[in-house]
Amino acid sequence: MITMQEIFNEISKNGGLTPSRKVKEIAERFPEKIAFRNKEFGIWHQISYEEFWNQAQYVGNALKFYGVGPKDKVAVHSENRPEWIITDIGIQAIQSITVGLYPTNPSPEVKYLLGHSESKVLFAEDQEQVDKVLEVIEHLPSLSKIVYFESRGITRYDNEKLISWDEFIEIGKEEYKKDKDFVIKMQDEIKSEDTAIMIYTSGTTGPPKGSMLTHGNLEWVATQIPELSFTTGVDNPQYLSYLPLCHVFGRLVDLIIGIHTMGTINFAESIDTVQTDLAEVQPSVFPAVPRILERMHAGALVRMKDASKLKQLLFSLASKLGDITAKRRLEMGERDFIARVTNFIAQLLGFRALRKKLGLLNVDNALSGAAPISPEILRFFMSLGVPIYEGYGMTENSAIATGNRPGKVKLGTVGVAQPGVELKLADDGEILIKHPGVFKGYFKNEEATKEVIDNNGWLYTGDVGEYDGEFLKIVDRKKDIIITSGGKNVSPSEIENNVKTSP
């Protein structure tokens, strides 16, 4: 079996691949390697990379059968599950474009997103999502087929556009038999400038905009994996998929990093069972949003408050040692000898047991992104022996911009520029980013595209930043900055973080 260092060496030498090409490569080299684990009714089911690639090819062939071709849009409206990523790979492999919808999107938003994207086929998770689209189906002339993953409650529906996942895959198998090289031929013709996925971002002054990320964007991100601050050095890494796959953060971790590191993606049973699933899976990598980390922090404190007097005493001693560990690592670096000793003792006193309950026992690298987080929350996890590196990115730059990294951490900042990233501040403090991962533009909105990408390729992020030494600090969204009567600029997010950690 291949080691992580060997994987990194291969990427450094040959570069990354588009997601579909990487899946094909792994399926050919390591067919029995486990790609997915999915929990249903308390039982874990496994899917190998060989089966993953085969099913993706069946998806591509079935889409061709229904008239889907290059540049056509295909939407997915579902919680995270193996079929989501299998479908995504199948769509991309035949040069079509994947459009993700949030499971919480109501009918009016489904109508807008499917209509604006001109999606030809929709993959819907269950009756709830099918009902949403059927409610507005007369407004969606481009939509020709609705494939549902779960059939409960739908089998009695009488609509010629509906087809089950199993039936769809069977059609794909039959088409595959007619031309086994179809998907591979389409895949070989992919150009780097072709759009691979479309991610809709909420509009504050208008409807959501469809950000077009190209195969070249995704390939460039994959090429950066050995140098990114939030990848793991652990062999056979385990991931827990719970961040929405229609969001760029979830897609970055699962679709690009998870697959390129040949990891196993474990799917949380639901967003409500994330904590339980974490404790069971014990992943190697933990990407998180502040809300999850805040909840874990609060839960740990409550757990200790309700513990026995002895456990409370041990936790208090471990916390004091953990504080020393965090302070030393921030000042002296990850390899500091004293920090190693204090962390070792703190783990014996109870932190190891707490990390296991939180599902962080095997995590050697964790990342916080997508929203600002309080430095106190980061300090808590660092004292626990789980350094969480805050990073910064957005849909329009493929989620790659800056990040704290081992040996280079400053709490309250989003770190330094990731390798291959050019960064500068405009005169008004707006953060400008330039790299090969900057998106192609907004779908059917050239005016908005010109507002955020200048003629030299610089992306205007809309975020205001400032430097703290060599580290970048996000002040706030440019449009959210409050100017007081005294002329002072005040950041609402800074006020929010102070409130969150206030007793």
Predicted regions and their residues:
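Conserved pre-ATP/AMP-binding loop-to-beta segment of ANL
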Residues: 31-34, 162-166, 173-200, 207, ...
